[in-house]
Regions:
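N-terminal, Lys/Arg-enriched amphipathic/low-complexity engagement segments
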Residues: 1-47
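Short, well-structured beta-strand-loop connectors
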Residues: 49-62, 81
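Histidine-anchored nucleotide/phosphate-binding helix
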Residues: 176-192
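Acidic low-complexity segments
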Residues: 81, 86-141, 151, 207, ...
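Conserved hydrophobic positions within beta-strands
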Residues: 77-79
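Hydrophobic alpha-helical positions that pack around
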Residues: 162, 196-308, 314-319, 329
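Ferredoxin-type iron-sulfur electron-transfer modules in oxidoreductases and energy-metabolism complexes
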Residues: 347-363, 373, 377-456
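Gly-rich Lys/Arg/Thr-decorated short loops/hinges at beta-loop-alpha junctions or inter-strand turns
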Residues: 106-107, 135, 157-171, 293
Length: 456
């Protein structure tokens, strides 16, 4: 078994409701609302207008910068609106609203690669870019940027199939039902990076998936190795996965690529397979719909832009006593206040919690037990990080306590007996640091422009 990482927690995985349920195809809704930002980086610019006819897989959003990814129509039909709509990250986001014509017309430009084995790394990067593929484990970093920046620098390519968040089972079902997509996608990455093997990291509680993948690897004679990992949260975090499989620790302030590792989510790998072998860009997402507030939990494959209310409807609806909705897992997901938000490329789960779920009340008084320090997988000191942030000392939080190294896994908040909002506070701290950096950059650019104007 692979190495264990420091810290971590063992929450009840709560996967029994869906881990034996096959993925169901959700019928496309009458209307999809596709946000122009489903990735880290610059939002896309809409390239369609009201009244335009669109087809499945047609590009409707042009990347707004280098770190960006195009967006495609998930249904065929007519553009009904291009306007701000409620967004899962909060507030609103410019979105393209498409009225479904239910003809399922596919864009004529979509076609598979004639000879996948002959693809050069540069050609694969271009295919991935045009397909709008991003990290689908939640981070949503554009995959073509990750590949191109890692070429010639990494010797470990790892597929993240840990799926360590409670409730979520979409990756597990994908491995059981679509193992060829996983292995062929991994093989494309092996050839692209020029590595002898690609490693797939799977937690020990999914041994049946590991067995299915190993059988497929043998049948395809693929350069892929399955590594069974300890069942511990957050085993699927990039830096912890890098350490578990390669034995290398990512330095403070650095990325896995700086330790010679490049890590891809399992569904991202399947999207690479689809882009090459079918030509289809990212137009759908497997989503686990679960939680005590869901009448009939399921794993659903949904068109991008499907309103989350349609997912719950397909699962028999919500219980009356439901009090909270979360997009993503319970540890790192985001609470939602609006049923009009829609499925995006990084949506792995929609959870609903009813009145019978255990609820806690946050208490402001830290008892200095140190549990948060013992479970932090980054070896940080959340007890002090929180206190300095509450005092407004962001400088000490950032530079002395290395607050920017926090991976926001939520292990500290999970174990805190005082129920202090530690993870939320650290996210706010990061936002303050990033805002200060952006302000400093804008000031420097303005001063430079003023100096150049004066010289002219």
């Amino acid at each position: 078994m692979a190495q264990a990482f420091f810290g971590g927690v063992h929450p009840n995985d709560m996967k029994a409701a869906t881990n034996e349920k096959a993925i169901e195809q959700l019928a496309a809704p009458a209307e999809v609302v596709i946000p122009m930002s489903m990735h880290i980086g610059a939002p896309c610019k809409p390239i369609v207008a009201v009244g335009d006819k669109v087809t499945i897989g047609q590009k409707i959003g042009e990347p707004g910068g280098f770190v960006s990814a195009p967006i495609h129509a998930s249904v065929s039909g007519t553009v009904k609106a291009v306007e701000p709509r409620p967004f899962s990250m909060g507030g609103t986001m410019m979105s393209v609203v498409i009225e479904n014509d239910f003809q399922n017309t596919v864009c004529p430009d979509i076609h598979p690669v004639a000879d996948p084995d002959s693809l050069t790394p540069e050609q694969l990067v271009e295919i991935v870019k045009n397909a709008g593929i991003v990290g689908q484990g939640g981070a949503t970093f554009p995959t073509h940027v990750k590949i191109s920046s890692g070429l010639g620098k990494v010797d470990y390519v790892i597929i993240n199939a840990a799926e360590c968040e409670p409730y979520i089972t979409g990756d597990h079902r994908t491995m059981l039902e679509r193992p060829e997509q996983v292995i062929k996608g991994a093989t494309l990455l092996a050839k692209c990076f020029g590595v002898e093997h690609v490693y797939i990291g799977i937690e020990a509680n999914k041994q049946n998936a590991a067995d299915v993948l190993n059988k497929t690897i043998a049948e395809l004679k693929a350069p892929v190795v399955v590594e069974v990992l300890h069942t511990r949260y957050p085993q699927g975090a990039e830096k912890q996965l890098c350490q578990a499989i390669s034995g290398r620790q990512v330095p403070s302030g650095k990325l896995p690529a700086d330790a010679g590792c490049c890590i891809f989510n399992l569904n991202t790998t399947c999207s690479i397979y689809k882009a090459v072998y079918t030509g289809m860009p990212v137009v759908s997402k497997v989503v686990t719909v679960s939680g005590s507030g869901v009448i009939e939990p399921k794993n659903l494959e949904c068109p991008i832009g499907t309103p989350i209310t349609k997912l719950f409807d397909a699962c028999g609806g919500l219980k009356e006593e439901t009090y909270k909705l979360i997009m993503g897992g319970p540890m790192m997901g985001l609470a939602q206040y609006n049923l009009d938000v829609t499925v995006g490329k990084g949506t792995g789960a929609m959870l609903a919690f009813a009145g019978d779920e255990e609820q806690y009340e946050e208490h402001p008084q830290c008892i200095r037990c140190g549990k948060c320090v013992g479970v932090c997988p980054m070896r940080l000191e959340p007890v002090f990080m929180y206190k300095y942030l509450m005092k407004g000392d962001v400088d000490t939080w950032q530079n002395t306590l290395h607050g920017m190294d926090c991976i926001e896994c939520g292990a500290c908040a999970y174990t805190c007996p005082a129920r202090q909002p530690l993870t939320h506070a650290f996210r706010m701290g990061k936002q303050k640091v990033n805002n200060a950096r952006m302000a400093a950059k804008a000031k420097a650019e303005a001063e430079k422009a003023a100096a150049e104007k004066k010289e002219a």
